[in-house]
């Protein structure tokens, strides 16, 4: 009997410590109505737009901001440039191929603080089923308070992801710029801690 209790001690300790560890991690909630995911491409006729359907989560394992993981999932078919013709072309197999690969995703692999409120966030970017490493550059406000904003920018070469076609009568560049504006609030746990 005594041996059985001793054998159970590690499992009991893990069960007791797990809630304490989780309670020490801040929990954030992104507010979609106050957030946007936009893109732009230089062209003979300006191409810029946003995605109307997407989801973003920001999770932490401790109050240290560099332990965070940013996970963004975008529904490619929700693209909106204000032009039905452009939207249909971008949804097609020449660009997003939304019918076969409905999600555009970015998931961070680490967060590196580069200044008092700036961060480089390398991660895996996937579009059209092609995944490559890309980096979001973030400017964050409200760190350490109950709410804040994140402005992230990233640029990628569309041809790296198999988007080699053009749009009829429009000359477009290869470089695509993405801007992510996220507003969120801390719903539980301690404030985030950053280096000054």
Name each model feature, range by range:
Residues 22-196:
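Low-complexity, acidic/polar, glycine-enriched regions of mature
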Residues 8-18:
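Bacterial N-terminal signal peptides
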Residues 1-4:
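Positively charged n-region of N-terminal signal peptides that target proteins for export
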Residues 6-8, 162:
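General helical structural elements
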């Amino acid at each position: 009997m005594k041996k059985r209790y001793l054998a159970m001690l590690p499992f009991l300790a893990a069960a007791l410590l797990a809630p304490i560890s989780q309670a020490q991690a801040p929990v954030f909630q992104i507010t979609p109505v106050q957030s946007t995911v936009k893109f732009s491409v230089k062209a003979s006729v300006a191409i810029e737009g946003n995605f109307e359907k997407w989801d973003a989560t920001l999770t932490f394992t401790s109050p240290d901001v560099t332990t965070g993981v940013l996970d963004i999932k975008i529904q490619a078919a929700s693209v909106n440039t204000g032009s039905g013709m452009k939207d249909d072309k971008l949804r097609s197999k020449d660009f997003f191929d939304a019918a076969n690969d409905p999600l555009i995703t970015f998931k961070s692999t680490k967060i590196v603080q580069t200044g008092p409120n700036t961060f480089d966030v390398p991660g895996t970017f996937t579009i059209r089923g092609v995944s490559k490493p890309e980096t979001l550059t973030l400017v964050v406000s409200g760190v350490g308070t109950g709410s804040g904003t994140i402005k992230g920018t990233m640029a990628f070469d569309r041809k790296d992801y198999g988007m080699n076609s053009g749009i009829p009568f429009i000359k477009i560049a290869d470089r695509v710029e993405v801007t992510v504006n996220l507003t969120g609030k801390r719903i539980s746990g301690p404030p985030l801690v950053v280096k000054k």
